[in-house]
Amino acid sequence: MDILKAEIARKRKQLEEKALVGGEKKYFKRSELTAKEKEEYFERCGYKMQKEEEEEKPSSSSNPVLELELAEEKLPMTLSRQEVIRRLRERGEPIRLFGETDYETFQRLRKIEILAPEVNKGLRNDLKAALDKIDQQYFNELVAGQETTDEDTQNDLKVHEENTTIEELEVLGECLGQGDDNKDMDTINKVLKFLLGVWAKELNAREDYVKRSVHGKLASATQKQTESYLKPLFRKLRKKNLPADIKESITDIIKFMLQREYVKANDAYLQMAIGNAPWPIGVTMVGIHARTGREKIFSKHVAHVLNDETQRKYIQGLKRLMTICQKYFSTDPSKCVEYNAL
């Protein structure tokens, strides 16, 4: 009995030392005792428990990146007011809250972008984005008050200077498809960039009022979109890692384009983009024996336009350059596709 009383007294003294009971306080929470024991454990191990201040304002997010950004000193506005408004509207947020300054709106936009980054960027309309970029260029020109001088060319389309002519490319085209893949890729790269440059020069040579019209902006946006679509293809050509089946088809297309056989080039394009056979639907592999549709699933029969979005885009860009080539380097109507369509 004495042992039990001594143990109860020891426990009571331990609680009084930890300030859990004593005076008018006769009860305590188990969580308080656990917290005290945890704190003592960390102190014995050489760590210090950091107590959260009750007066601290509740954080709007547990994102450490956001807390770090908000804790920094005030940074200057790196975006214009128009850009801030555009980004807020894209996210369905109000462009200004009551009593909010331009800088506070900018800070709110930064907070929104960190908390909810754009996850549907790839689903945007590329042509609309190119149109918006061209509109912004003309708007910046108007705001700056520029007059019609040589400086207006800064808003023209980018021209790829290949320092070559169509005659030189036609000579290079005679060597296409003879087994030298690296040389073929270099020739394809030159031809595509040459056509982009020809297209850009023609658009830059237009009158200023034509450039600012709806049709003029649409033509410029289409050229910009095509150039952006072809960037992955240019990268593969530069690194010499273009897939063999795609390379073979594009080689045939470029070869026929340089020979001004646009009907044959279009047939080669359809062969690459659509293929001979549709994708098989249903069961293609049961047990150890492949079914009939299985044997058609290889590079020469499938539709590359269905592979992924990147391939679809540069295949579409290639078709536009085929049309541009037919427009500027014409031949007999019988060898053209949709003659005088442009």
From Swiss-Prot:
Keywords: mRNA processing, mRNA splicing, Nucleus, Spliceosome. It is found in: Nucleus speckle. GO terms for cellular component: nuclear speck; U2-type post-spliceosomal complex; U4/U6 x U5 tri-snRNP complex; U5 snRNP. The keyword Nucleus applies. It holds the Pfam family PRP4. InterPro entries: Prp18, PRP4-like, PRP4-like_sf, PRPF18. GO terms for biological process: generation of catalytic spliceosome for second transesterification step. Interacts with the spliceosome. Part of a complex containing U4/U6 snRNPs. Participates in the second step of pre-mRNA splicing. Belongs to the PRP18 family. This is Pre-mRNA-splicing factor 18. It comes from Xenopus laevis (African clawed frog). The gene is prpf18.
